[in-house]
Amino acid sequence: YRTDNKPINYNPYNLVLNPVIARPKQNFRTQFNYKLDNTFTLRSRVELSWFDKKSEAPQNGFLTFIDFLYKPMLKPFSGNVRLQYFETDDYDSRIYAFENDVLYGYSIPSFFNKGYRYYVNGNYDVSKKLSFWIRFAQTIYSEKNTIGSGLDLINGNKKSEVKMQMIYRF
């Protein structure tokens, strides 16, 4: 559980001075990890968010995901998959989720509006000196025809990303 009070300017009556008030946001998160055996791990999370906008109706958010992690002992390959659903009323009730990524990379995107996200990560160690990493991720927004704005505008409701990495240790 987490609660936070952000100060905002609040002026619904167009006063000369904008009074500053606290705008509360609350998050509740529960996570479940289960090691099926020495090779497979299952991880699941559910997160809820509540955001009080004072002059408007409160905003809510919901996110859930399930991860399948595969890491065999003494094998040169490993990988993981995430399937995720999110639904929030607007950007203020967004929810952040850490994602597994390529080595030395990181991803903590924010999720708002309504949609799905999945990603697949793979790693193959060719030798002690050479390894390859690959990642494919895609977000599908249920109720949008365009994503982003300006130079980042995407016509369509899908946003995809691909990362490939080769590491040579010497």
Q: Where are these predicted regions, by residue range?
A:
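Exposed, low-structure sequence patches enriched in small/polar residues
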Residues: 1-170
